[in-house]
Every structure is written in structure tokens, then in C-alpha cells.
Amino acid sequence: MSDHDTLTMVGLTSTVPIEIVYASGLKPVDLNNLFICADDTERMVGQAESAGFSHNICAWIKGIYSVVVNRDLKRVIAVTGGDCSNTIALAELLERRGVNVIPFEYPRNRSKSDLAAELDRLRNTLSTSWDKIKTETLRLNRIRKKLLELDRLTYEENLITGFENHTFLVSSSDFKSDPDMFLRSWMIFLPRYGTEFRDRIG
């Protein structure tokens, strides 16, 4: 990963509204996906334990830590409320390494106004506007609409395999840091299922 990539990438410890990240000119990257797809997950867990994580903390948190360190990411959005409580310890260790940790909390009370305030705080932190966020939402929703149809064709019509479904849907948490590339990979995938299928979902 180049120096430019590390400066524009924002690691995500869990699902957040990526429209806000893209609207700020940055690229979200789902740290969970990078960890679980790595070839050396056991080594990464051991690396985190050597850095101070105890053995009884979940492997996911330790894997996320090692992904951030190994890829030299400079900025991480840490979901410290509504997700794994160990994310707080993760955030503290990353901050000690000089990583800019941006906390994000889903309100426990499920308050719409509290969630709106948290989203606005994230927007301010990333220095973007609601107009830009709305533009990104429209762009990403066009892709999400295709994924909804893909999901339906998996469980209702058995036209898409579970593996293919899983690959696309899990990757939509960050659209692999490049929605245009994600959409191109989608268009490459479609021809396997013939013209009628492409017309219905493309």
C-alpha cells in the first residue's frame, strides 16, 4: 500500500454509514474483511497479543489491530457503542501508536435524534457536507438495489449460489474501497447467467 493510500484510507471496525466517508473524499476499508481473508490470521492474533492484548480478548479485535498496524493505516473509525466492548481497548492501543481514532457510537436508547446527532458529529469530523453525503447515498444506493435483487434471486429462485451472494453482500460494507470497481466486478459477474438474467438485475 502506497503512502497516498494510507492517507486516504479510513479503517472501519464495524459497519458505519460509508456515504459520509466517501463524501469526505476518503476511502473506507472494512478491517474485518481484511483480517478474515488474510492468509496468516493466527500470526496476526499473536502479533496483537505481543503488543499487549490479553489471550481472552476476542480474536477479531486482535486481528483488526494487526491489520491497521501492518497496513500502516493513519485513520480508523472505531465503533465504540453498539458493537464489541473490546473496541475501546483497541482504540486506546491504536492511539498510542499515533493512529487517528474517530469514535462512533450507535445510541443504546435507539433514539432517532441521538443517532442523527452522532451522524452529524462524524460528518463534522470528516469535514464534509450533507449535500455531498446525499450525492454519495444516491450513487451507492444504485449498487445496493442490485444487491437486493441478487439476494432475492438467491433465496427465492436459487439462481445465485450462497457463496456468490455472500461474497458480494459482505463486500458491500465498504464496496472494496472503490464503488466503481465494485460495480465493474458486478458487470463481469452477470454474463454467467445469460441475457434474461442481466436484463432483470443489471
Residue ranges and their predicted role:
Residues 2-8, 120, 124-202:
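A charged, amphipathic alpha-helical module
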Residues 1-135:
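Trp/Phe/Arg-rich N-terminal binding region typifying the photolyase-homology
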